[in-house]
């Protein structure tokens, strides 16, 4: 593969394959069986150290294979 091949347009089959990979990666990350248990454990640890019950999770789309979960914690005064 040369440097010029890098900038060459992909064919429709390659583009379709890449799109399918994106869809499968997204579906795989959404259906992980341990995600709900992990969220509960994270909430328990946060509550143990902060005494906060106002905890929110938000899913943020990352790159092709990574999905980010943002945790928002409202601390009591």
From Swiss-Prot:
Keyword flag DNA repair: no
Gene Ontology biological-process entries: cell division; regulation of division septum assembly
InterPro entries: MinE, MinE_sf
Keyword Cell division assigned: yes
Pfam families for the chain: MinE
Keywords: Cell cycle, Cell division
Superkingdom of origin: Bacteria
UniProt family annotation: Belongs to the MinE family.
Listed NCBIfam families: minE (TIGR01215), PRK00296.1 (NF001422)
Function recorded in the entry: Prevents the cell division inhibition by proteins MinC and MinD at internal division sites while permitting inhibition at polar sites. This ensures cell division at the proper site by restricting the formation of a division septum at the midpoint of the long axis of the cell.
Protein name: Cell division topological specificity factor
Naturally occurring in which organism (per UniProt): Helicobacter pylori (strain Shi470)
Taxonomic lineage from the root: Bacteria, Pseudomonadati, Campylobacterota, Epsilonproteobacteria, Campylobacterales
Gene expressing this chain: minE
């Amino acid at each position: 593969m040369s440097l010029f091949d890098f900038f060459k347009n992909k064919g429709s089959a390659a583009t379709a394959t890449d799109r399918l990979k994106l869809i499968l990666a997204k579906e795989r990350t959404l259906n992980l069986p341990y995600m709900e248990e992990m969220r509960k454990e994270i909430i328990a640890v946060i509550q143990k150290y902060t005494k906060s019950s106002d905890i929110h999770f938000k899913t943020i789309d990352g790159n092709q294979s990574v999905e980010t979960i943002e945790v928002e914690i409202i601390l009591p005064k």
